[in-house]
Amino acid sequence: MNLYEKEMSSILFDLVDKHGVVGVKTSFEDEGASFNEVVRLKETANQSGTKLYIKIGGPEAKRDIKDAMVIGTKGIIAPMVESPYGLEKFVKSVESIVYDNESLQSLDLAINIETITSVKNLDEILQSDVVNKLYGITIGRVDLVGSMGIDRSQINSETVYKTVSESFYKIKKAGLRAMMGGGVDIHSKSFVERLHKEGLLDKIETRYVMFELAKCLSDFDNNLSKAQKFELTWLTNKNKMYSYMANHEKSRIDMIQGRLLSER
């Protein structure tokens, strides 16, 4: 591990030990994480005593599922599930790869509800024969408000709250864990607290960090700030790594160009 990764481990260990963090999350989908990046995050999670969760590129992204299992993920999340069929494709795809029943039982499967179409079809999704294979459902607010034609600045509005809370009520009634991501920052505190008081929310997610809600709320602003520091350190690490690689290739490019010019 390099210095940045050691700092990440230190931040994450503190978050796990004292602030309710229950996992690190990364994504082959919207984030476009590479296999090597996910391996490094997995090592950081291991060093900090927590688990890694991976969002795959789609409900039937079998290559991503295979990579996630090789890396050793605790959970797999399918994005943009908008119908019972999408849910069924996801579950069947996982089951076609994770053939060992014990491994399958220990794997947390979740889907993202993140469009207004998903919300409208939620009743049907929850009535699917395979919904009992899920650990939980995450509502992704950024894509949700975009699909509703609402500006992101209104993500904590009453209109969005009504849509989210009604969806979580159905999710909890189905016996699933209710999780929320998308625009989770210090400005969403009252939004999160309302859901918690109504018994509708179990976990929240920043881009990379997953919190168990009850413990997180005890020092919400500080906990979210620490999660942002973890993300900043990781992004700085990636920036340094890829800058080094680019500079290394640039020196090779310059050398080859020099050779070609000398041959003229």
Task: Please identify what each model-predicted range represents.
Residues 1-264:
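Expand to "…catalyze enediolate/carbanion chemistry for C-C bond making/breaking, isomerization
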